[in-house]
A protein has these predicted regions:
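Conserved ABC transporter NBD signature motif
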Residues: 57-68
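Conserved ABC ATPase "signature" region
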Residues: 113-131
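Conserved ABC ATPase signature
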Residues: 135-139
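Conserved catalytic motifs of ABC-family nucleotide-binding domains
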Residues: 156
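Catalytic Walker B motif of ABC-type/P-loop ATPase nucleotide-binding domains
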Residues: 160-163
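H-loop/switch region of ABC-family ATPase nucleotide-binding domains
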Residues: 196-197
């Protein structure tokens, strides 16, 4: 097990959002976290990267490759735990596509020659050479979300977290994005954890599904088993 959550409780603004979550995710798995609005799926996803944990009362423990996540440096978390947000505009911080690809590597102090190599590799892999020098504000929603994904993958993460990444895309862009995630998972062997409203969005790709309701884990489904956890 490479990511383990033990008895996670989170309280925000006096409301208990997560109520004793226990979960274990194996390396290289593709896991879907499914639940309606208010189920706690996005809050759970954010617990897996300390810089994104919302301010509030929290208890429990998360292990990342056997280490308490609180003890894993921000440098390591920035490089090895990638996150793609629901809103394509939320993540973009620069005005040019090429700079957006380079920004994360610059922030961790990578030498410029290595940055150029990595950026060129990812631009080619994602097929964005034709808009490499464009302004980010001229991109479509699908292009922005693809750029966000490429900007995460240029860091060579071990874990990729996605918070409803296709909910604001049109059906064609959403299908293309999901196909790209599937390709990344298959070719790079990264661990993928995606929060979504509907099982339909991820059913064709996932190894395991975690179902949530009202801050609790209510069931887990894999290809070979279904386990229900009564309240």
């Amino acid at each position: 097990m490479k990511l383990t959550a033990s008895d996670i409780h989170v309280e925000l603004g006096g409301n208990e959002i997560l109520k004793g979550i226990d979960a274990a995710i194996k390396e290289k798995e593709f896991v879907g976290i499914i639940g309606p609005n208010g189920s706690g799926k996005s809050t759970l996803l954010r617990q897996l990267k300390t810089s994104l944990q919302p301010v509030g009362q929290r208890s429990g423990r998360i292990l990342y490759y056997g280490r308490d996540l609180e003890e894993v440096s921000q440098y390591t978390q920035s490089a090895k735990i990638g996150f793609v947000f629901q809103n394509p505009d939320t993540q973009i911080v620069t005005d040019k596509v090429w700079h957006e690809l380079a920004f994360g590597l610059e922030s961790i102090g990578m030498p410029q020659d290595m940055i150029r190599v990595r950026v060129a590799e990812m631009a080619s892999y994602f097929g964005i050479q034709n808009w490499f020098y464009q302004s980010t504000d001229t991109l479509s929603g699908g292009q922005k979300q693809l750029l966000n994904l490429a900007s995460v993958m240029v860091m060579h993460p071990k874990v990729l977290l996605l918070d409803e990444p296709v909910s604001q895309l049109d059906p064609i862009a959403a299908a293309d994005f999901m196909a790209t995630i599937h390709k990344l998972h298959a070719e790079f062997g990264i661990t993928v954890i995606m929060a979504e409203h509907s099982l339909e969005e991820v059913a064709a790709y996932v190894d395991e599904v975690i179902f949530m309701k009202e801050g609790r884990l209510i069931a887990v489904r894999t290809h070979t088993r279904f386990v229900y956890f009564p309240a």
